Amino acid sequence: MAIAKQTTKRGVEIRIAQLQKTFGDQNVIKDITLTIEAGQFVAIVGKSGSGKSTLLRLVAGLEQPSSGDLLFNGATLKKSQASITMMYQDSRLLPWKKVIDNVGLGLKGNWQQKGESVLHAVGLSAFSNEWPSTLSGGQQQRVALARALIREPDLLMLDEPLSALDALTRSEMQDLIETIWQENQFTALLVTHDVREAVKLADRIILIEEGVIALDVENPLSRPRDVTNKQLIELEKQVTSRILEKE
């Protein structure tokens, strides 16, 4: 399922220093400092309104910080020329375009062969010329993943992309994302409310609480991870109990 010809690690290192973001008089992100290694899979968890999605948008360049620094391989986003793509809870497919055209949306030149390749990588080779309306929710998210992969990301941002899916489809998508990440070695940054999902997928789990980092824990478990594994359950309990402390 590897979608790039490169064999060397291409994930981008992210350095965040004293990052702050205010909206009016509300300080949503408060002095966050952290480093994410190139090729690392990091999950950001926390309650609604904690600032985790705002942090994701800042890293993606969709919002500008009020203060602080964001560096990608030691340079600003623009100067680094890092390829950053995003997946959302909503697949955001255009209903009047075929699946293959949704995958290549905005691309120029001869991208069709590459489009077919990434559709194969996500298990949708047979659906290239279908309309989005004929696909299930899980299949639509696979198209969204293919659309992200065709751009050969250095950083893949995942903003609750699986939260609307049923349990079985969600598990299948988790396995697919993990496999593609392992084969293509980009940096992955996942925002999720699901602590089990974070523990299953991530090398590192970061808890954001009221705009600050409340917990930053490494995940030592080998892959692939079984959600019934005792150590996984214990790590899930550790993170969940910390989230619930202030309730």
Swiss-Prot record:
Molecular function in Gene Ontology: ATP binding; ATP hydrolysis activity
Gene Ontology cellular component annotations, sorted alphabetically: plasma membrane
Domain named ABC transporter: residues: 14-235
Keyword vocabulary terms for this entry: ATP-binding, Cell membrane, Membrane, Nucleotide-binding, Translocase, Transport
Bilayer disposition of the protein: Peripheral membrane protein
Signal peptide boundaries: none
Domain of life where this protein originates: Bacteria
Catalyzed reactions per annotation: ATP + H2O + aliphatic sulfonate-[sulfonate-binding protein]Side 1 = ADP + phosphate + aliphatic sulfonateSide 2 + [sulfonate-binding protein]Side 1
Binding-site residues for ATP, renumbered to this chain: 46-53
Compartments in which it is found: Cell membrane
Entry EC number(s): 7.6.2.14
Record-linked InterPro entries: AAA+_ATPase, ABC_transporter-like_ATP-bd, ABC_transporter-like_CS, ABC_transporter_ATP-bind, P-loop_NTPase
Family classification: Belongs to the ABC transporter superfamily. Aliphatic sulfonates importer (TC 3.A.1.17.2) family.
Protein task: Part of the ABC transporter complex SsuABC involved in aliphatic sulfonates import. Responsible for energy coupling to the transport system.
Quaternary context: The complex is composed of two ATP-binding proteins (SsuB), two transmembrane proteins (SsuC) and a solute-binding protein (SsuA).
Protein name stated in the entry: Aliphatic sulfonates import ATP-binding protein SsuB 3
